Swiss-Prot record:
It comes from the Bacteria. It holds the Pfam family LPG_synthase_TM. The chain crosses the membrane at residues 15-35, 56-76, 86-106, 131-151, 175-195, 254-274, 298-318, 348-368. This is Uncharacterized protein MG306 homolog. It is found in: Cell membrane.
């Protein structure tokens, strides 16, 4: 049953306001990064001019990371959704994946992607409970994959704790990195707990409904919330069954690990791109590939918790601190600064600009559909569908 236009939160006015907010957020983020790192137009030209032309094919690794992530957002959502008789044109899946990628980039800790996925599936006709199951059963694997990659690197780094302890910045970075990784694990656990816990389900719904009541939007009564509490018991069973699909679960985990490894290793690719010929202070010459990889993925994870504005600032601070703690190399600060900025420029800023165009295209599509609503194909009623199958098996 479609929501009446008067009761819909996604009016043209609200969508346009949200779009301007996202655009403002992107502009502010870029300005904060530029001013904090003291990056000027001349600096950007210098970084571009320092690119080693013989190593430019390394850029393909960064492009591969973007393509793999985009393909993953299409494949996993399409694959899981089709089991519930959910269908959409191929171009809508591509647009959907681009907008998901956009929210991954512009929202803190990529927290905006899952609410968008939830809204998109429901808007396209998927039942709320089915959409929640789809989103929550895939959302925690990224944090889990990061933990499986980063913690071994952290243990390797900890073997050199004596060196880090002698270096004040390295010591500070070490413990902030530890806090950042703990935070990552907590987010993953909370994601699973929120999806599975009935009490948490009711608590969140109560909070959301209080907010909707405050802004004078339609909200659920206490009786309706408690009814959802009862429905949640059945949802828990289905969530458990979804996670127990070992083939799909292992595939989700391995795919996220691959995406994370390509993303972390792309920083090494950037240092290869900015490598100076006939110089002795190149990062990739001073440190082994394993050391750079371990320090890189710890630095990126630590950026969740380092109290430094902008992702570049945190990543640059941690990488420089750890590299200097391992081996004091003259001149690496400049190359780390150039490398981290170039990495973010190629893997974050350019994709953010491109995917923002897709986001604008999606907003236009939503406005058009709002003015000229189309009938949507219903998906399988998840609860009754599974219940009926189980009932037939027992009979």
């Amino acid at each position: 049953m479609s929501t009446p236009k008067s009761a819909s939160f996604f009016t043209r006015k609200n969508i346009l306001a949200f779009s301007f907010f996202i655009a403002f957020l992107v502009v502010v983020s870029v300005l904060v990064t530029v001013f904090f790192l003291d990056i000027k137009t001349g600096d950007v030209k210098t970084i571009i001019n320092t690119i080693n032309r013989t190593n430019w094919p390394w850029i393909l690794l960064i492009v591969l990371g973007i393509v793999v992530t985009l393909a993953w957002n299409i494949i996993i959502n399409w694959w899981v959704a089709r089991r519930f008789c959910f269908h959409a044109p191929w171009w809508e899946w591509v647009l959907f994946a681009c907008v998901v990628q956009f929210f991954q980039i512009v929202t803190p800790l990529s927290l905006g992607q899952d609410p968008f996925r939830l809204y998109w599936f429901i808007k396209k006709g998927m039942k709320k409970q089915t959409a929640v199951l789809l989103v929550t059963s895939t959302g925690a694997f990224w944090n889990l994959a990061q933990a499986l990659i980063t913690w071994p690197s952290f243990f390797v780094l900890s073997q050199n704790y004596a060196l880090l302890e002698q270096n004040h910045e390295g010591f500070v970075s070490y413990w902030f990195s530890f806090a950042g990784m703990i935070f990552d694990v907590v987010v993953a656990i909370l994601f699973i707990f929120i999806a599975y816990s009935k009490r948490m389900h009711v608590l969140i719904y109560s909070g959301v409904n209080q907010f909707r009541k405050w802004i004078k939007r339609p909200y659920l009564t206490k009786e309706q919330i408690y009814q959802r509490f009862i429905d949640k018991a059945e949802f828990n069973k289905l969530y458990g069954l979804e996670i127990k699909r070992l083939g799909l679960t292992i595939f989700k985990l391995l795919a996220n690990i691959l995406i994370a490894v390509v993303g972390y290793f792309s920083v090494f690719a950037v240092f290869a791109i900015v490598k100076k010929e006939n110089a002795t202070n190149n990062v990739i010459d001073q440190y082994s590939t394993a050391d750079i990889f371990n320090i890189t993925n710890i630095a990126i994870t630590a950026s969740n918790f380092i109290p430094v504005p902008s992702g570049e600032g945190a990543t640059q601070f941690v990488m420089t601190s750890f590299l200097n703690a391992f081996k004091s190399a003259v001149g690496i600060e400049s190359q780390v600064k150039q490398g981290v900025f170039l990495w973010r420029f190629l893997s974050v800023y350019i994709p953010a600009i491109l995917f923002s165009l897709c986001f604008i295209g999606w907003v236009v599509q939503v406005v058009i559909e709002f003015k000229h609503p189309k009938p949507v194909l219903p998906t399988v009623n998840l609860i009754n569908h599974h219940f009926w199958n189980n009932k037939k098996l027992h009979n």
